[in-house]
C-alpha cells in the first residue's frame, strides 16, 4: 500500500486540526453545566451522552492526517478512563491546551525536546502538589456520596445510591450495574457468597413456589473431582445424614448414576441433600473452591492434598447458617469460617490484584474478594426511554469508578481548583535552559484550562473567574452549578485525587509525543474506479431455443 508523508510544521498543523476537532466536541461536556452530545447510530435511537470518552470514541475524521491527531487525543481520554474511571474530558482539555501552547513555541523556533523536558519537570511538581492536597476518604460515606454525585453530573440520587451500596457491601464489595425493568433506580444486595451454579436436578427443590432448595445450617462437602462412584461417597454421606442436618455437595460434576441415587434417596427418605457443580474453570476453579472452604470452615477434598473422597470425615465439611440454591445460582450466607482465616485469604487476593497486569484477571480477583468480604450489590438503573437509559448508565458507571479512585488516593477540591493551587508549586521552578523554562510555563498556563472550560460551559467569562480563584487560598473556588464562590470541600464539590493526577500525566505524555513529532506517515487513499453501468437492452435473452 502506497504511503503519504508530511514533515515539520505542515505535519504538526494537520495533526493539530484533528486534535482540535475531537477536543472541541469533547470539552463541551465538562462541568456541572456541560452540554450533551448526540451521537447518531446506524441502528436504533441516537445516543445522548455527557461522557467525554464516549464522545471521543465515536470520532473518526475523513482526512487521514487529521484523524491521526484525533486518535492521539482519543488515547488520552480512553487511557484516563481505564486508569482512573473518570476525568476523560479534563484530560482532553489539558492535552489540547498543552499542545496549543507548545506548538506556538516550537513554531517560533524553540527546541521540542527541551520543551518536553520542561513539561515533564512541571508535571512531576504538580503531581506532588495534588498528593499533598489530597484528603483521605476513609469510612466517611458522606464524602463518598459527594464524589459520586459530582461524577454523576451532579445527580444526588445516583450519589446517594452508590454511597448506600458501599455501606451495605463495604468499600471492597462488588457493585454491578444492570438495567431495571421500570423507571426507578434501586439497589439490590446479595449477602454472603454467591456463585453462578445451580442445582443439578430439580428434584432437590424444597420451596416449589420459588423453585429453590433452601437449607438451614447445612454441612458443605467441597470436592474438586467428579463423583462417579457412590461407594466412595457413602463413608461421608452416612454420618452427614445421621446428624440430621442437610448436606450441600459441591463437586466438579456428579455422574448420572450417582445423581439418580441421590435423587431417589431425597424423594424416599426426605434426605435433605443438594448437589451443585463447582464454579469457575481450571486454576480459577481450584481457587474458588478454596475460597468456599475458608468461608465455611471446611477443607477442599483434593487428591493434590493427598485426600481421597472415601477418606473424608465430618470434620472436613464446611458449614453455614443458610444456603439457597436456585436453578442458576448458589448463595452461602454466614459461613462458619474463622475470621482471621478469611482476613488472611482476603489479603492474599489483594496482593494478587496489586500484582496482576491483566484487566480480566483483576476483575475476577475483585469479584472473589467481594464475595469473601461482604457480598455483591446490584444497582438497577431505571429510565423512561432507551436513550435515557444508556445516558444514565454511563453516568452511574462514571460515578462508581470515580468513587473507587477516591477511596484509593483521597479527594481534592473540585472544579479545577486543585490545579490552580498547584501553580504555586511551579513558581520557583526553573529549567536548565530557556526552552525548558518555557515548558514549565506551558504547564502553568495549561492547568488553568479545566477551570476556564467549566466556566465557559456555564456561560461566564473564564479569565475573570480564574483570576479570582487564583487570588483565593486553600479550597476556595467557583461553584459553577450555583454560580457562587465558596469553599469547595464544604459545598461537596470534590474530585478524586487519582483522577486529577492521571488526567494531567496522560495529557502531558501525549502532548510531549505530539510536540516532538517531525514526520507523519499515512496510507494513501486509492481512487476506486466507478462500477460500469449495465449496457442497455440486456434485460433478457428471448428467442433462444
From Swiss-Prot:
It is found in: Cytoplasm. It comes from the Bacteria. Gene3D superfamilies: GroEL, GroEL-like equatorial domain, TCP-1-like chaperonin intermediate domain. It is an enzyme of class 5 (isomerase). PROSITE patterns: CHAPERONINS_CPN60 (PS00296). ATP binds at residues 29-32, 50, 86-90, 415, 495. One of its GO terms (biological process) is protein refolding. Its EC number is 5.6.1.7. One of its GO terms (molecular function) is ATP binding. InterPro entries: Chaperonin_Cpn60_CS, Cpn60/GroEL, Cpn60/GroEL/TCP-1, GroEL-like_apical_dom_sf, GROEL-like_equatorial_sf, TCP-1-like_intermed_sf. GO terms for cellular component: cytoplasm. Keywords: ATP-binding, Chaperone, Cytoplasm, Isomerase, Nucleotide-binding. PANTHER family: 60 KDA HEAT SHOCK PROTEIN, MITOCHONDRIAL. Belongs to the chaperonin (HSP60) family. Forms a cylinder of 14 subunits composed of two heptameric rings stacked back-to-back. Interacts with the co-chaperonin GroES. NCBIfam families: GroEL, PRK00013.1, PRK12849.1, PRK12850.1, PRK12851.1. This is Chaperonin GroEL. The gene is groEL.
Amino acid at each position: 500500500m502506497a504511503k503519504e508523508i508530511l514533515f515539520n510544521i505542515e505535519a504538526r498543523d494537520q495533526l493539530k486540526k484533528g486534535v482540535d476537532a475531537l477536543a472541541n466536541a469533547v470539552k463541551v461536556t465538562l462541568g456541572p453545566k456541560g452540554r450533551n452530545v448526540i451521537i447518531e447510530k446506524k441502528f436504533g435511537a441516537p445516543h445522548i451522552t455527557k461522557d467525554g470518552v464516549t464522545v471521543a470514541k465515536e470520532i473518526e475524521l475523513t482526512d487521514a492526517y487529521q484523524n491521526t491527531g484525533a486518535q492521539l487525543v482519543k488515547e488520552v481520554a480512553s487511557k484516563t478512563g481505564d486508569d482512573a474511571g473518570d476525568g476523560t474530558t479534563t484530560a482532553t482539555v489539558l492535552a489540547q491546551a498543552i499542545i496549543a501552547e507548545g506548538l506556538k513555541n516550537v513554531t517560533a523556533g524553540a527546541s521540542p525536546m527541551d520543551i518536553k523536558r520542561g513539561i515533564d519537570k512541571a508535571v512531576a511538581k504538580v503531581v506532588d502538589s495534588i498528593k499533598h492536597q489530597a484528603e483521605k476518604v476513609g469510612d466517611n460515606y458522606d464524602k463518598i456520596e459527594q464524589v459520586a454525585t459530582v461524577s454523576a453530573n451532579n445527580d444526588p440520587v445516583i450519589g446517594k445510591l452508590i454511597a448506600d451500596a458501599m455501606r451495605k457491601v463495604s468499600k471492597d464489595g462488588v457493585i454491578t450495574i444492570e438495567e431495571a425493568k421500570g423507571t426507578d433506580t434501586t439497589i439490590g444486595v446479595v449477602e454472603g457468597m454467591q456463585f453462578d451454579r445451580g442445582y443439578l436436578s430439580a428434584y432437590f427443590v424444597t420451596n416449589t413456589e420459588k423453585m429453590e432448595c433452601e437449607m438451614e445450617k447445612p454441612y458443605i462437602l467441597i470436592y474438586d473431582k467428579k463423583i462417579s462412584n457412590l461407594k466412595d461417597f457413602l463413608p461421608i454421606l452416612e454420618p452427614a445424614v445421621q446428624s440430621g442436618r442437610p448436606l450441600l455437595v459441591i463437586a466438579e460434576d456428579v455422574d448420572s448414576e450417582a445423581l439418580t441415587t441421590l435423587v431417589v434417596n431425597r424423594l424416599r427418605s426426605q434426605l435433605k441433600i443438594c448437589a451443585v457443580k463447582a464454579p469457575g474453570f481450571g486454576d480459577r476453579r481450584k481457587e474458588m473452591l478454596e475460597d468456599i472452604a475458608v468461608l465455611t470452615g471446611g477443607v477442599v477434598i483434593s487428591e493434590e492434598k493427598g485426600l481421597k473422597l472415601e477418606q473424608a470425615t465430618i470434620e472436613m465439611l464446611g458449614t453455614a447458617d443458610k444456603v439457597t440454591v436456585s436453578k442458576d445460582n448458589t448463595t452461602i450466607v454466614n459461613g462458619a469460617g474463622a475470621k482471621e482465616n478469611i482476613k488472611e485469604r482476603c489479603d492474599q487476593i489483594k496482593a494478587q490484584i496489586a500484582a496482576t497486569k491483566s484487566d480480566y484477571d483483576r476483575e475476577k480477583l475483585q469479584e472473589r474478594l467481594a464475595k469473601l468480604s461482604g457480598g455483591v450489590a446490584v444497582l438497577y438503573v431505571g429510565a423512561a426511554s432507551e436513550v435515557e437509559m444508556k445516558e444514565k448508565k454511563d453516568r452511574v458507571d462514571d460515578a462508581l469508578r470515580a468513587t473507587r479512585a477516591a477511596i484509593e488516593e483521597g479527594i481534592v477540591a473540585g472544579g479545577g481548583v486543585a490545579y490552580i493551587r498547584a501553580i504555586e508549586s511551579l513558581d520557583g521552578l526553573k529549567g536548565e535552559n530557556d526552552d525548558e523554562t518555557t515548558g514549565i510555563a506551558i504547564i502553568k498556563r495549561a492547568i488553568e484550562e479545566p477551570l476556564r472550560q467549566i466556566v465557559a460551559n456555564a456561560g461566564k467569562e473564564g479569565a475573570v473567574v480564574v483570576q479570582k480563584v487564583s487570588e483565593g487560598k486553600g479550597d476556595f473556588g467557583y461553584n459553577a452549578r450555583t454560580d457562587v464562590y465558596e469553599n469547595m470541600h464544604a459545598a461537596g464539590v470534590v474530585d478524586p485525587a487519582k483522577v486529577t493526577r492521571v488526567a494531567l500525566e496522560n495529557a502531558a505524555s501525549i502532548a510531549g509525543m505530539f510536540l516532538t513529532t517531525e514526520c507523519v506517515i499515512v496510507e494513501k487513499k486509492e481512487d476506486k474506479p466507478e462500477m460500469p453501468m449495465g449496457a442497455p437492452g440486456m434485460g433478457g435473452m428471448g428467442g433462444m431455443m
